[in-house]
Amino acid sequence: MSQKLYILAKGIGRRKEAVAQVQLLAGSGQFIINGLPANLYLQEDPRSILAIDAPFKQLHVDHSADKDSLQTLDTIVKVQGGGKIGQANAIKLGVARALCEFNGEYRKSLKDSGFLTQDSRIKERRKYGLKKARKAPQYHKR
């Protein structure tokens, strides 16, 4: 039986080189990243797992809640680029944006907690005449 999956909300998050596309679906509370469960994809890293669950915890939403409540959302994520920490932070921003699209009342709580603020720090470009972004070749006085 193929059931049509209805996307309830979408969100895109970026951090460093990582880009995460997040979709919220009605379901059983699964968190899938690139086809794998979140714990498996993030290699059981507690910092990354806490980061991606933080927007849900802020709203007191539990993935394993009752079947008849609003809290049974499947979160499907496609993420590419960057490292594991950058990807986790991109997912966190994408989830927060998707939750805001899903229910506008969540926006104030997420905004006050800083989940909707994108971290704008990226790698600085290399300049000509220098070895790296700021590292200059050794200076010879004579």
Swiss-Prot record:
Q: Which Gene3D superfamilies match?
A: 3.30.230.10
GO process terms (BP): translation
User: Recorded GO terms, molecular function?
Assistant: RNA binding; structural constituent of ribosome
Cellular compartment(s):
Plastid, Chloroplast
SUPFAM superfamilies in UniProt: Ribosomal protein S5 domain 2-like
Where is it chiefly localized?
plastid
One Pfam family in the UniProt entry: Ribosomal_S9
> Cellular component per GO?
chloroplast; small ribosomal subunit
Q: Give the intrachain disulfide bonds.
A: none
What keywords appear on the UniProt entry?
Answer: Chloroplast, Plastid, Ribonucleoprotein, Ribosomal protein
Q: What family, per the record?
A: Belongs to the universal ribosomal protein uS9 family.
How is this protein named in the record?
A: Small ribosomal subunit protein uS9c
**Organism for this UniProt entry:** Stigeoclonium helveticum (Green alga)
Q: Which gene encodes it?
A: rps9
